[in-house]
Swiss-Prot record:
This is Cell division protein ZapD. It comes from Idiomarina loihiensis (strain ATCC BAA-735 / DSM 15497 / L2-TR). Interacts with FtsZ. HAMAP family: ZapD. The gene is zapD. Cell division factor that enhances FtsZ-ring assembly. Directly interacts with FtsZ and promotes bundling of FtsZ protofilaments, with a reduction in FtsZ GTPase activity.
Amino acid sequence: MTSTDNDNILYEYPLQERMRTYLRLEHGFEQLKASRVCFDEQAEPFFNALFAVTELLERCDIRTELTKDLELDKQRLQKWEEHPDVDRDALQRTISEIEHCINTLQDIPKYLRQLKDDALLTSIRQRFSQPGMSGLFELPQLHLWLSQSAEEKQQQCERWSQTLALVELAITLKLTLLREQSVFAPIQLQNGFLQESSEQLLAMLRIKVPRSAKIYPVISGHRQRFTVRFMPLPGESKETSLHDIEFELARCSP
């Protein structure tokens, strides 16, 4: 996820393959929501997002990996139950949310089967998976479907989206827990390059860069070692300073 506020741009980089998958799914669900807003003007982004999310869920064993991660989160939170200063109600709500998500993840094959058995989606999916633009002359069944009223189309899109809503909920919860347990620390670099090793296993890096700096991070690494190099936007002036760079870094552990 890359987001902005008034002063900073937030970049995130996964250091584990399953975190990469989680972030891709989060992005796919965000695209699915955004495309529904302008569905009447352009339907292609919605179907592209729906098929991309579906394909990712079919290729990756999300059920096993995400269940395992949420179980670990649950165990970690349960250790706080006897702490005198903890908000027990809030803690129990979060634990209950985790348990609910773990239970619903077991039904992922059923959700995917529902989409795979949808006659319209099955008839157009292969065309959407091919490179290049598709014209409605190649998809007359979609052309007919698009001629329905806006209300009918929105209702159908809602049903398709709701099929995967519980998966989205679990992904959102996992990434929220991961992000909230990390703390940003200020860092200043003299040469625009950071290399760091960690005894603790890391899952993701989060980097806040001032908008005014007009630079972006190029990140590489794995769970115990990573590098960050800052670069100006391609095509921008080479005079962009890469010295005395100030940013904030959060190291997220699984």
